Structure formats: C-alpha cells, structure tokens
Amino acid sequence: MIEITQVNASLDEAGDENTCLIVGKRVAKRILRCKDSEIKSIELHRKSIDARKKRDVHFILSFRVELTSPHLEREAVDSVSERDRSRVRAIEDDEPSFPSPVSDAPQERPVVVGAGCAGLFAALTLAKAGLKPLLIERGDPAFRRSHAIDLFLKERILDPESNIQFGLGGAGTFSDGKLNTGTKNPAHRLILETFVEAGAPRDILWDAKPHIGSDILPKVVTAISQRIEQLGGVVRYRTKLVDIRIDASGAITGIDVQSSEDAACEPIETKHLILACGHSARDIFELLKDHNVALAQKTFAMGVRIEHPQRDIDRAQYGALAGHPALGAAPYKLVAHLPNGRSVFSFCMCPGGQVVAASSEPCHLCVNGASLNARDGRNANAALLVNVTPEDLPNDDPLAGIELQRACEAAAYRLGGSNWNAPAQLVGDFLAGRASKAPGKVKPTYPLGVTWTAIDEALPQHIVESLRLGLPLLGKKLRGYDRPDAVLTGVETRSSSPITVTRDRTCHAVSTPGLYPCGEGAGYAGGIMSAATDGIRCAEALIADL
C-alpha cells in the first residue's frame, strides 16, 4: 500500500468522493509513474479545507493506493521524483480489528455501566470477544429518549433519567456527533468504520473534521446496541446503578441496580465492572466517594454558548467563496491567551446548529450545542470557555468541582426565571457590564426561550473577567466575533468532567481491583472518539485479566 499526501484540488474538481478519486488516480499515475491497469485500488484517506488564503480556498487530499503487486509498489515508490518524495510513503496495510473470541469464556458476564460511546464500544469489544456482556443504561433507548426530550421542550417536564445527557448514545447523541480528536490512535479508523457499518455517512472516513449529526446518530447507536445483542450481549435500559459491592480486600464482587424509584434493588454478581457512566452521573461519583474509591479533582472548563449568523462566519473564514456548495457551513476553533494568565477558548463548535437544553437535574439549567447532518441552520454556535483548575476550588473535596457546576446551574435557572428559560445577554452589553433587554439581529436558538439579563452571577468571577478580556481578542482573530449583538446563552458547565476516578496503567481503579473507570466521566476522554477509544482500551484490559 502506498500513501500519497498533500494533493491540492479546487473546490469544483473535488466536491464528492467520486470526483476526489478521479483527481487521486490522475495524481497517482503521474507521481508513481504507473498505468491505469496497474492500479488495483485507490481510496480517499483524508480531505481537509485550506482557507489560509481567502482568494485560494481549496481542498488538500490524501489517498491510499494499492498496485497489482508488492514488487510494483516498491518500484513505484523508488521511482518517485525528488520533488514529490516527501508526499509518498509505503505503508503496511494492518488496520486494527476487534479481538477474536476468547477460549474458555467465563460464565459470569462482565458488566458495563453506561451506554454512551465509551460504554457502547467497551460492550461491543467484549461481545466480539465472546464474553456476552451486560450493558446497563439508566436512560432510554434512542427513540424513547427522543420522546422524553420532546416532552421537556414542549411541556417543560424534565425526566432526570432520560434527557440530553442520559440514554443510549450518551451526551454525544444529541450534541452534533462531532468526531474530531486531537490525538492519533490506530483504533480511530476501526471506530469510524464501525459507525459507517451502523449507518453513519461514509464521508466520516476521510473528512478532516468529521461529524454525523444529531438526526442520524440515534439510528447509529441503536444499530451498535443491536449488534451487541446479536453477539450474545444483553442491553438493559431504565436500569440504574445504585450500589457497588466490594469485599474485604477492596475488590469488586457485584452491583445493585434499580429499574424504577420504587422498585426493589436487584443484585448482580460480577468481578469485572467497566464504569462508563458519563460526566453528568453525579450520583455515581458520590457513590464512589462513599465507598472510598480513589477520586481526584481535575481541571475542567465552564462558560457560555456564543451565537453568530452562520453566513458571517462563512465570509470570515472563506471570503468571496463563502456559500460554495462544496464547502458547506464553516467551522472555527479559537483561543486567546490573556494577560491574567488564563485562556479563553472555543469548544464543540456547531456550524449551522442550535443551542440545546442540556439539563439533567431539576432546577439546574445548562446548555450545549448541536447540529443536524446538513448543518443548515441560520446560526453558528460554540462553547466559549475558561478553565477551572483545582486551585480555583474552595476546598480539596474531590467533588468540589461538581458542587461548583451545580451552583452555576442553579443560578442560571433562577436568572432565566425558574421556568427553564435560559439567561442570555448580548456581547456588547456583556462587555459594557449592563443587562440586556432584547435581541439585536442575531436571534437566539435555545428552544425553550431566553430571559434577557446579565449572566455575571451565574459564573465564577474569574470566568466573567476572562470572557470580558478574551472576546475583543477573539474578534481580532475572526472578524465580527465580538459583534455587539452576538448572543451569549448560559451556562455551559458540562464540557468535561471535574473529577478523575484514578486508575493504573492496566485501567484498574487503583483502590478497587475489578473496577475499570472508563471514558469522559472518569476523566480519561474528551469527546466521542476518545471516549470510544477508551472503551476499547478498558475492554481489552478486562479481557487480558481473564
């Protein structure tokens, strides 16, 4: 296999996979000095947008080419000109795979708690290994979860167990399904291929900034859960972890679950528990603390959602080529380093998306962002965040970060009017230190409505001060970012977990053998791809322990 990188292509000649492959074959024949008949296969491996020069926005492509024989491939690589040599390399075709079925699988099922991406991929990995895992999820399957969210949006009745945070697919299902990751791992390709097999669009295999969309993700995670069941696993919904059982040596011996508030606790025996509960399962972290499971504070981030007209972001990013059908809605990623030593940064940017109601606790309001697959909404939105370090917390309690989140969410609920309206403020008013009274040209998309106010009292002072310092600096990096009528909606508190469930190199909780803390909630991931990767890692660690 040969990889060819840094192939420039115009917007008109590389709009879709087929046109990209035409470009790739033409370039491969020139660089590798081969004939059409000598190319056995060619695949588009990566596609990104180069918008550094607004007059020359174009695609950068990379391809993987297989010739008809290894000998021919070696000759082709050796014949590459000096000018192109840095763009061509021979690679091994050793794509990662799920583990094969283990011999002498134990009768006792391993248990996975949480059906977000970490839990789903942990359970799928165990199922592929023939271990028939039990996957328990406190929320609903995807279609019933959608009904619970609709009820919240229409009647303002929050279901604490089935909402934007809880249910099949976890928090990522209804927050766009972005598959960006800042790390490289061989498992990423396996995860993307699994998503495609489950119904995700093929372009996630090569798009440099892949996303699935909140309209497609429910079907995808449903298909993955069904595959787990086909392989002998069991998936149980509306099943909540209420206790863990630990023997005198500190090892896991089982768990207790509950299917409803008034149901009796059901004991489940297991010596292997993957805990992938997500960052919003605060009751689980309290349970772990009660059982003296090792926890630690970690840096997390909080702030607001900021909204701009998507057309303005497109023009700022793509210039005169904004609106070209091959480009779609423009994303952005920004950071400003401040004189006070802190930073303000964008996170989870949703092109053509909307701000969503992400609450999971009564009288505690938080927001997130989401896009459908088409990304064709009128506004762009992103979280605008500032880090909260352990030094910012009032004490060394490992749950102090959770209590700060809760305090901010309770304040946001009150500021919004105690009716699930979100507090909102215009950027110009926020910078001037005055409350807002009405929107400008940018209309907020938060679906339950907003209350115009000042958001200061819903956030720690260091975050408010940093946002005020950072917005004008970000406006210098992306034209119009600090426009006076851009909308700030509060509060964004769930971007990352404020705790770490401490584990060793073998993925065991350091205090509790048999417990495998996993994913974003445990402090080992930050998004769909890293969570899924950690799910596979923990499952492989469990398999190695058998």
How would you name each of these model-derived features?
Residues 1-59, 65-198, 202-546:
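Residues forming the flavin
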